[in-house]
Amino acid sequence: MRDRFGFDESSVAGAPYWRKPQLGRRLFFRHLASAVGGYMLMPGQRPMETIARAAVTPKATAKYCIFFMLQSAPSHTDTFDLKPSNGFPAEQFKPTTYNGVLFPQGLMPKLAEQLDSLVLVRSARAWANVHGLMQTWVQIGRNPATPLAKISPHIGSVVSLELTNKSAVLPAFIALNGTPRAASGFLPVANAPFLLTGGAGLPNTAHRDGRERFAARTALLRESEAAGVPTAAELGALPDEIADWKLRSQLLMYNSQVDRIFQLDGDTRTQYGGTPLGDACLTARNLLRSNMGTRFIQITYGSWDHHNNLYPRLTAMAGEFDSALGRLLADLKADGLLDQTLIVAQGEFGRTVGPLNGAAGRDHYQQQSIVFAGARIKGGRAIGVTDERGARTVEPQWSRDRDVRPEDTEATIYSALGIDWTTLKRDARFGRGYEYLPTSEDVYSPVHELWG
């Protein structure tokens, strides 16, 4: 069935979301064997066991990941897959070609200067074009409309589970400038996103009655707990979990190193744009510089929902994004941290192609572009070629020879961070396995072409 652009979704390389890639016989029986074996082994096992189901080699080039959720979906053909035939304001956008990559230098001049660090994946496609559905899909790496999605953790929570250091002061997963669409799911709450809003810094790190009074009350609390706490056999692991939470909270309090992370210098704030997004990017830089335990940062920025008056609104949004990300890339590169950090920026889908709609805007559309940087990827290029309007992929230019889907992006993040994306976690509490990547290898996989 063709849409109003004359495009038949069923012809896309890779099936539409209601007919996702199917399991072959061999993979089906491999998973069946894992499931039966896991079920038989469950009695007497720890609450969560890890099953690696395929021999894969993660890239492991990154220590950190900064994920930009460009909420409500920017127009891909006016930003990272620029299409002159669609009629953007050329004098303002100043389209310029860098090593064969067409880029709107006038719209995003700072990113144009950093293009040698960027890879623009233009062969990406969303499964649907509904905001809430796809924002969640992108952040959990699977269909939110399935029963398992209700307990599915955010990608950042999986990273937290895998990479949290017991000596860390700060949470492994921090969310800036907006609330993620998912939390820790069935994973321990310690892996949930630690939400920070605005540029006011970390709240409640000093007691209102002073440090000495706080220390005295803490000591009194310890004595009270020691006198009346039930035994470990009665409470299981709960006392240890509570003690761990208290310890981590106390490490954040009266900590000058932590305070410095959230003290944003006025001149530097201006260089980042002096906006909430700029403050979030500056905070992300400070978190990475501190090396105090944070491994995954989500920065939310939107709304890009430009159904009307596209070009004035896009110019303002892209300008803020350019100032903040452009400066972040420059600072991380100067610090030697860019090679240790995978940066991913994407919306939940793209925007309609060709002429603007009757309100001078663009509506929801599944084709999109994703920006990658850092982690020693080979920058200054694009992966994937779309048709002259940007409506569909004509050359995927990666090993799967189809569109890049959200699950593939999830696998790419895991691979860069050294995480086996084929992992299955089996939790006795709900008696089933949870795949980091749905149906894993043989269906979805990392875009390793980013590394050349």
Question: Model-flagged regions — what are they?
Answer:
Residues M1-G452:
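Ligand-binding pockets and gating/stacking loops
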